[in-house]
UniProtKB/Swiss-Prot annotation:
GO biological process: urea catabolic process
Protein name per the record: Urease subunit beta
Gene Ontology MF, one: urease activity
Transmembrane segments: none
Annotated compartments: Cytoplasm
Main location: cytoplasm
Keyword list, A-Z: Cytoplasm, Hydrolase
Pathway: Nitrogen metabolism; urea degradation; CO(2) and NH(3) from urea (urease route): step 1/1
Protein family membership: Belongs to the urease beta subunit family.
UniProt-listed SUPFAM superfamilies: Urease, beta-subunit (SSF51278)
Pfam families: Urease_beta
Gene: ureB
GO cellular component: urease complex
Class in the EC hierarchy, top level: hydrolase
Length: 108
């Protein structure tokens, strides 16, 4: 084995990211005067206010891109992006502090 080499069992086929999770597609426009970059696990609902989109629809969603990647929105640019629902406990903490807890109430 070569240092840094990754060996993959080809018989297993491709790995599908976020299989079975709820996804949605939205249009995002950067109305600011600076580029805005959004990382793979950032809660889209809480991104920079210069990014304009139907914000309420994005509660509990992140970009559907591989971990560690990001999407950059240049000033004046409009892009279509795919989102994927957060999984696990569905609790959001940090970011801009707009949620700070469970996404759904206990009654659901």
């Amino acid at each position: 084995m070569i240092p840094g080499e990754i060996r993959v069992n080809q018989a297993l086929g491709d790995i599908e990211l976020n299989a079975g999770r709820e996804t949605k597609i939205i249009q995002v426009a950067n109305h600011g005067d600076r580029p805005v970059q959004v990382g793979s696990h950032y809660h889209v609902y809480e991104v920079n206010e210069a990014l304009k989109f139907e914000r309420e629809e994005t509660l509990g969603f992140r970009l559907n891109i591989p971990a560690g990647m990001a999407v950059r929105f240049e000033p004046g640019q409009c892009r279509t992006v795919e989102l994927v629902a957060f999984d696990g406990k569905r609790e959001i903490y940090g970011f801009h502090g707009k949620v700070m807890g469970k996404l759904e109430s206990e009654n659901k």
